[in-house]
Amino acid sequence: MIMLRIPTRSYCSPSKLIKGVGLSPLKKSLLSKKIKEDIHPSLPVRTRFAPSPTGFLHLGSLRTALYNYLLARNTNGQFLLRLEDTDQKRLIEGAEENIYEILKWCNINYDETPIKQSERKLIYDKYVKILLSSGKAYRCFCSKERLNDLRHSAMELKPPSMASYDRCCAHLGEEEIKSKLAQGIPFTVRFKSPERYPTFTDLLHGQINLQPQVNFNDKRYDDLILVKSDKLPTYHLANVVDDHLMGITHVIRGEEWLPSTPKHIALYNAFGWACPKFIHIPLLTTVGDKKLSKRKGDMSISDLKRQGVLPEALINFCALFGWSPPRDLASKKHECFSMEELETIFNLNGLTKGNAKVDDKKLWFFNKHFLQKRILNPSTLRELVDDIMPSLESIYNTSTISREKVAKILLNCGGSLSRINDFHDEFYYFFEKPKYNDNDAVTKFLSKNESRHIAHLLKKLGQFQEGTDAQEVESMVETMYYENGFSRKVTYQAMRFALAGCHPGAKIAAMIDILGIKESNKRLSEGLQFLQREKK
């Protein structure tokens, strides 16, 4: 076990705990003690997801919710939801509703009625009184100006002290306190922190000992505030009280919360409560190993949803941010897992310590996989058609579109789609006549030395009989290019250009089957006319 003093004004991010060494990446972390034993619980657990509605859900928050959910489901335990909304000034309109909406959309279902911390002030007051009466907390009447001076002077010390308070108010007598209360002087409630914060065990990282840097010639104290001057609890107090009262056994949260953990454990000890097990999961980073942010790839889940990301793809994507499935299953399933499969195979022993790199190429790989599964399922295929129809109806005459046609396109050609939002861009030619204005396709079409043969080919092929099926079309096309000595590539490129006006496109047989014989013959004829005009 290694003890580190934390050289920041408040607890810094784990990646900056000491110069050149941090918790991230943790492959060779100084704070790690390899745990060989099985860390996965054998009994049912109670976990929670505790977001603050100060913004909309992002990838990091969704991963935290998912891991807590999967651990609960895997052990036949319970997964709870708590809204940490005590910081009223930072609340964002619509953020609370967004949390409910995204969890439901992702099929992350909580087991009990959600708890809102803003509705539990009386509960927190009760436990603050317990700490005050036992001398483990005290009222602080210091002004903002005095506190700012203390922080400034602490930083001027050599070495500087990251703990800044001098416990002036901890020594006030009862009469002084009563007098200040009677005068209506604003106050906070501070926790009387221990001389040293307790060492704790993180199930992923092992034993950790984090202490604030202090100057022993000018003693200051890291007495965190439990109740703000507006009488609302701080995150630290509400977090500990709620986790205890909710019976939470395991807390999975981001690595950035590691520096807060000694404070929380000290509070548990002050109340005489048992602590939950802690698991701090690695940071999400870009492919270049930069911390993910709104400017660097951490889009809200709502944005991803609008872009056409499917919930099952997003869940699969997030599950692999810091967790590895059993090797035998990963090789068989190519890392594609349904929620039901994840609930079965999720295990804390699969958690990894290194930063999790977010590569959106992987997301679209998963999205394509799950989109194909939806297309092949009659029930979800109907839902996809429902999603597509409104946009088509806003563009085209109803005579050119139908639910049956859209379903047929998806079944025959949807294998090329990575997201349903691309349906129109990929398959517009099924709903409108070719414009023959795709420069790349036109160049390829007209630059062929076989233009005379192509003209002959289109003329012959533009005579399909009604009732000809896809297999017969394939056979006729093959016969045509074999008998006339054309190359297969040139034949199909010419037909695709005439039918769709683009290159590449769907398979020829599928295009003719969807367009119908009459429309296909018409387009082949128009393609021939275009060729003849352009070659004059």
Swiss-Prot record:
Protein's name in the database: Glutamate--tRNA ligase, mitochondrial
The enzyme's E.C. designation: 6.1.1.17
Catalyzed reactions: tRNA(Glu) + L-glutamate + ATP = L-glutamyl-tRNA(Glu) + AMP + diphosphate
Similarity comment: Belongs to the class-I aminoacyl-tRNA synthetase family. Glutamate--tRNA ligase type 1 subfamily.
Protein keywords: Aminoacyl-tRNA synthetase, ATP-binding, Ligase, Mitochondrion, Nucleotide-binding, Protein biosynthesis, RNA-binding
Motif 'HIGH' region mapped to chain: 53-61
Gene3D superfamilies: 1.10.10.350, HUPs
Annotated GO CC locations: mitochondrial matrix; mitochondrion
Positions occupied by motif 'KMSKS' region: 291-295
Top-level EC class: ligase
Amino acids binding ATP: H58, E256, K291, L292, S293, K294, R295
The species this protein was found in: Saccharomyces cerevisiae (strain ATCC 204508 / S288c)
HAMAP family linked: Glu_tRNA_synth_type1 (MF_00022)
Binding site for L-glutamate: R48, F49, A50, E84, Y235, H236, L237, A238, N239, R253
Localization, UniProt: Mitochondrion matrix
Function summary: Catalyzes the attachment of glutamate to tRNA(Glu) in a two-step reaction: glutamate is first activated by ATP to form Glu-AMP and then transferred to the acceptor end of tRNA(Glu).
Gene Ontology biological process terms, A to Z: glutamyl-tRNA aminoacylation; mitochondrial glutamyl-tRNA aminoacylation; mitochondrial translation
Further comment found in the protein's record: Present with 2940 molecules/cell in log phase SD medium.
